[in-house]
Amino acid sequence: SIGALILSPDVLFMRWSEMDVWSMLTWRGIEMGIILILFSSCFKIFRDNFKNIFSPVGFGIICCQIISSFFFTYGIAETSASLILFTLATSPIFASIFSIFILGEKTNNSTWITACLALIGVGISVANGDNVLNAPEGSVLIGTICGIGAAASLGLSLVLLRYQPNIPAMTLIGISALCNGFIGLLIVSPGLLFQG
């Protein structure tokens, strides 16, 4: 619930910007990347562990974060913010599944019951997705796929961070965001970059 509260203003500003998906990806990525990298560089523990980013697990987490951020941004541009946030809330389900294979953890029954209830909630949200006020006129199905894609890649990145906990997460997310910003910059039409 804390994560949803933190993400809510981000989603609100993204929607208010009325930018296309590539402009949002560019600005959000570059700004978030610079802020997180600068902020994390103020802490000795992040500076000491910086070299751990350059490992197979580190690059895997960067890829997961890039994919998650792309799906999240595209989903926000495509459909209702509530649907994206609701589907994003399924990331612990994916984290539980990935942790079985990567960490060898066993998941208890209460986790699977919670997962089923969350999926029912997503189903209800998707079924009523066309009736949301002020939502973009995009596809609810594509938005749902984007939300689930963002949740799955976020869940995998969290499990990989647990697999190698000495990787500085904040710095890594900043690098991923910066990569997303540069990807958006390569694709966005220059005329659209300053509109919104």
PLM region spans:
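Hydrophobic transmembrane alpha-helices of multi-pass small-molecule transport proteins
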Residues: L36, S110-G129, L178-G184
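Membrane-interface helix-boundary motifs at transmembrane edges
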Residues: I45-I53, I100-S110, L161-T171
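C-terminal transmembrane-helix exit sites in multi-pass transporters
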Residues: F72, S91-C116
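Hydrophobic core positions of alpha-helical segments in small-molecule transporters
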Residues: I2, W27, T87-T90, S110-I113, ...
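Transmembrane alpha-helices of multi-pass small-molecule transport proteins
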Residues: M19-I67, F94, A152-S157, G174-L192
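Specific transmembrane alpha-helical segments of multi-pass solute transporters/efflux pumps
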Residues: L7, F43-L83, L88, I124, ...
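Glycine-/small-residue-enriched transmembrane alpha-helix faces in small-molecule transporters
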Residues: S1-T26, C63, F71, L133-Y163, ...
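Hydrophobic/aromatic residues within transmembrane alpha-helices
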Residues: S17, M24, G75, T87, ...
